[in-house]
């Protein structure tokens, strides 16, 4: 007697939905939060996977651009200023996050063309 009951089948090791989808973001937690938030009466099985994938992609995109901005400023640590520069210099991210204010982010350096000094032509005799 093996003590496993009738079937004798060994239960497979539990595998998270995040690892099945190849994601780092927690699919189970996102599913729970979608249910708890009362966004809809029912939540499909694919919805939290898709949402986790989108969130992971956006996070990776912003972090990559912010890392580039930090490296351009000769820094090894990403600060809110680098996030601001990364988002505002990217056309699509800027449009997506147009209504977002980043604390301690500052503004993009920009001088209007009319305020710049006029270029005078030097007269050569």
Swiss-Prot record:
Basic residues: bias regions: 1-18
Region annotated Disordered, chain positions: 1-21
Function: Core component of nucleosome. Nucleosomes wrap and compact DNA into chromatin, limiting DNA accessibility to the cellular machineries which require DNA as a template. Histones thereby play a central role in transcription regulation, DNA repair, DNA replication and chromosomal stability. DNA accessibility is regulated via a complex set of post-translational modifications of histones, also called histone code, and nucleosome remodeling.
PROSITE patterns according to UniProt: HISTONE_H2A
Name assigned to this protein: Histone H2A, orphon
Keywords: Acetylation, Chromosome, DNA-binding, Isopeptide bond, Nucleosome core, Nucleus, Phosphoprotein, Ubl conjugation
Annotated positions of the Phosphoserine modification: 2
Complex and partners: The nucleosome is a histone octamer containing two molecules each of H2A, H2B, H3 and H4 assembled in one H3-H4 heterotetramer and two H2A-H2B heterodimers. The octamer wraps approximately 147 bp of DNA.
Organism, as annotated: Chironomus thummi thummi
MF term (GO), any: DNA binding
Protein family according to the UniProt entry: Belongs to the histone H2A family.
Entry GO CC: nucleosome; nucleus
PTM comment: Monoubiquitination of Lys-119 gives a specific tag for epigenetic transcriptional repression. Phosphorylation on Ser-2 is enhanced during mitosis. Phosphorylation on Ser-2 directly represses transcription.
Origin superkingdom: Eukaryota
Placement of covalent cross-link Glycyl lysine isopeptide (Lys-Gly) (interchain with G-Cter in ubiquitin): 119
Pfam families per UniProt: Histone (PF00125), Histone_H2A_C (PF16211)
Subcellular location: Nucleus; Chromosome
UniProt keyword Cell membrane present: no
N-acetylserine PTM positions: 2
Statement: the UniProt record of this protein carries the keyword Chaperone: no
Secretion signal, residue range per the UniProt entry: none
């Amino acid at each position: 007697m093996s003590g496993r009951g009738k079937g004798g089948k060994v239960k497979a090791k539990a595998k998270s939905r995040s690892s099945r989808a190849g994601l780092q973001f927690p699919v189970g937690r996102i599913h729970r939060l979608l249910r708890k938030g009362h966004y809809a009466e029912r939540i499909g099985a694919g919805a939290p996977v898709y949402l986790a994938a989108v969130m992971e992609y956006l996070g990776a995109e912003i972090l990559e651009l912010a890392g580039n901005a930090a490296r351009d400023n000769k820094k090894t640590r990403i600060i809110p200023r680098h996030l601001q520069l990364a988002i505002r210099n990217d056309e699509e991210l800027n449009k997506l996050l147009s209504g977002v204010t980043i604390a301690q982010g500052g503004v993009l350096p920009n001088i209007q063309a009319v305020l710049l000094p006029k270029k005078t032509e030097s007269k050569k005799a």
